[in-house]
Amino acid sequence: MSKSIVIVGAGINGLVAANYLKRSGHEVTLIEKKPSPGGACANESFIHNDIRYQYPSGASVLGLMQRFVFEETGLSTRLKTFSPESPKLAFFPNHKGPTYIYRDPNELDAELKNKWGESGDATAFRADESKIIDFIQSGYREGRTPSIDEANSVLGNDLVDLWIKGDARSLLDHYFESDLSKIYMAMTVTESGPVSLSEKYSAFTIPIMDSGSVFNGYYGFVFQGIWNLTQTLSEINIGLGVDTRLSSNLVDKD
């Protein structure tokens, strides 16, 4: 049965929800306070030598979206994307040259041992992280909220205590010996929000931030700016018949 649904907020979550609901046969109204859609995927511009340049004022890269969402919404046929496959470079003071953060766990393990004197096990870290990511992704399509009980059943208590319920500091101490390795891996937590590495459940931030599947857990770029993703999805939704109301306030509800 078709329903009339109002979604407040035209950020990426509101836009994706509107897309799926409209394609499922519902009447959808999307209300956004700002004059343009996008939420955190916003942009600003400046003029230099009579040329206007745009830059992201919020999010800048694409990484957490699931591939099936990227494809089913129609975004994959409308956008150009790029994810560099060359290793990231990590620089620390008093170290000659960069350390290469390889995607291949065995290459990464060898590099960390060579450059940072790492005697831990980066290969085991990535292998166990993949198990957690697989568990997280397993419920995305069904919209199923994961639970600790389900995690214990699928992953076992030891992995759950370490990777989900535990703190990031203890997690990194478990796999790594070098302070430089721990600092680098901890950046995933510190970049995502003001959470202490010693806080319970902070370990879960690491696999969560690597759980997108558009680029297989890595991050990439949208041609001409990440804001084109939300602008394009808004255009797709309007074409489907989503009633999109910008510069609007929600005054009351029934």
Model regions and ranges:
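Helical element adjacent to the flavin cofactor pocket in flavoenzyme catalytic cores
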Residues: 208-253
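Generic, well-ordered alpha-helical scaffold segments in large soluble proteins
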Residues: 24, 171-175, 232, 236, ...
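Flexible loop/turn segments at secondary-structure boundaries
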Residues: 37-40, 191-195, 252-253
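General beta-strand structural signal in soluble alpha/beta enzymes
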Residues: 31-32, 183-184, 246
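Rossmann-like flavin
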Residues: 95-200
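N-terminal glycine-rich phosphate/pyrophosphate-binding loop and immediately adjacent elements
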Residues: 3-134
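Flexible hinge/switch segments at interdomain interfaces of large molecular machines
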Residues: 199-208
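Generic recognition of stable, solvent-exposed alpha-helical segments in well-folded globular domains
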Residues: 10, 16, 107, 124, ...
